[in-house]
Regions:
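Histidine- and acidic-residue-rich, metal-dependent catalytic cores
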Residues: 3-239
Length: 239
């Protein structure tokens, strides 16, 4: 079954790479992050494998969107955005007849722009009505889109992207968000940073429930700061 799934993915993702290099790279990034988050969520090996496939294929429907819209070097008009929003439906239709792909994969593709509060698309469904695969892919999709430079926008820093995601408590699955945040390492151990108190410090430990607030060692004072609890040094800038 895995070989047949791989063959189906290779054909579809190959077509996407030809039509749009950015979306191809984005899909690989989303697949990778989604698999990491799925593992943290507790999914088994088969489900993690399938979430990877769903991540690779989540934007396959963009191959049906006109290039002048897909690669427009400016923000889309309302009419153009309405066409762009159909890509998840196009993707589902492309995969619908592929019997070797599970329904979870297909629903992940169809629903990855749905929001927990019902303000997503294409169906505007809410909460647990959104397939788990779609809820998992959604967080990684948003993060990668935020940190990637596009002709019409500058990239967010990883820190700002994480803060944006943390603010989306009404749109995203909170449990999935928590798993994502516990999987993201913004400040690798050993990285030198500048603290808001003016001191230079080195990352010594990341805190799973406070990804923006690692523990650091002050290089001049030799003091360890727990930034989750020390508001005087809360801001961190990588040097």
């Amino acid at each position: 079954v895995y070989k047949r799934q791989n063959d189906a993915v290779a054909v579809d993702i190959g077509a996407l790479k030809i039509s749009d290099e950015y979306t191809f790279k984005h899909s690989v990034d989303v697949a990778t992050m989604s698999m990491i988050v799925a593992r943290k969520y507790g999914l088994d090996d088969k489900q993690v494998y399938e979430i990877g496939i769903a991540g690779l294929l989540h934007d396959i429907g963009k191959s049906k969107v006109p290039n002048e819209i897909l690669n427009k070097a400016a923000r889309l008009t309302d009419e153009e955005f309405a066409i762009m929003k159909q890509h998840s439906v196009y993707g589902y239709r492309i995969l619908q007849s592929k019997e070797d792909l599970s329904m979870e994969i297909k629903l992940g593709v169809l629903q990855h722009h749905e929001k927990m509060n019902g303000k997503g698309y294409p169906m505007g469904i809410t909460g647990d009505k959104i397939d788990l695969f779609a809820r998992l892919i959604s967080v990684s999709d948003i993060y990668d889109a935020l940190v990637t430079e596009r002709p019409y926008k500058k990239p967010f820093s990883p820190r700002d992207a994480v803060e944006m995601i943390m603010s989306m408590t009404e749109e995203l699955d909170i449990t999935v968000m928590r798993c994502f945040l516990e999987s993201v390492i913004l400040y690798p151990v050993g990285t030198d940073v500048a603290l808001s108190n003016g001191e230079t410090a080195r990352i010594v430990e990341n805190v799973p429930n406070a990804v923006l607030r690692p523990k650091v060692l002050g290089l001049t004072t030799g003091k360890v700061y727990d930034l989750a609890n020390d508001v005087k040094c809360a801001n961190v800038i990588i040097l």
